[in-house]
């Protein structure tokens, strides 16, 4: 069952044109001379690059998923960088010529959205030339989070400190197709931030977007490929709603269409991190919460544990298509489902051990055949020490490459970024602590929308 309230409220959000670019890539021939110089200037073509930051060291990572190269940059060394900041998320545009980085609020600094120009890159030398193009302050120093107070009321659902924000955190970057606009969400409040990625400005008169009852604790407004519908997640305890928006790319308006509940008032799933679109109408999302908290409504009989849901944005309904399992070899969601992706007819679920009574004991990547989207068929679960590196935990985010050949899966706890080959469902490349990674987060592959 679902809640789907149709409203006529119009919210202006800037929209123009975001053009699809050529799928050409710069790649290394295995037989090339060792002195071959990879092209330095990255523009006008879709590039095989992904970016991430490091929670612990504050580094910026650039991964080349074509030739498996890695470049590590200390952003403090870039002229114009605003200081020693706790970094959060990244975005790289399809051409690979511009990177956006967000930072958390501190007593000394506001939360920032920082635009970097990529002047040139040398994968052989492991260097990149970056220029600060803009530093956009999203608030004032010392701005606290606005998350609801929540307490544990049973042994099944603790309240971990990592999810209770201490100040403004800017998450959920998404690109609106066929426009010049990039969106971020402050999951710690109710604000959607809108950036013109051509001018590197917060859009005057439009930013921030605040819609009471909708934009609170959102982790990204995820648009379909045509840029006509956006889905907002509920990234906090007892938020069981997916917000549905209609965007007008020409006028910049966003119509609030309604909300889809993951279940009904008595039994529902809650706390969703990401949405993945299947086509122009259908999408999937996954939940993370195990049981009730102090925020749970008195009318709620049960919180449905971590599960996967098929969203019909035309009918405004949600159908549970993958249930929870208590067994590591079970045919369901074993840990909290943090992220998901659908490529080559298969559903991939990043499972993280962060919301139960243990923390980071393990982490898995579950794979299902999605030939029948209403009835996924379990294929296998990639496990630490077997399919994944020993000690691997907390599969947090998935960023597919634009050709769907690889999935880049990041773990901010165990320090790994994995390249999964979707043809064989095996790990094709491991970047980890031995390469200098500590707590990588905010993985974003060029050519993706989020």
List the predicted regions and their residue ranges.
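Short, conserved, GDST-rich strand-edge loop motifs in beta-rich repeat architectures
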Residues: 36-48, 103-112, 234-235, 285-305, ...
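Surface-exposed loop and turn segments in beta-propeller and other repeat-based domains
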Residues: 74-83, 126-166, 205-214, 255-270, ...
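Hydrophobic core register within WD40 beta-propeller blades
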Residues: 51, 90, 173, 221, ...
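Beta-rich catalytic cores
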Residues: 86-88, 169-171, 188, 217-219, ...
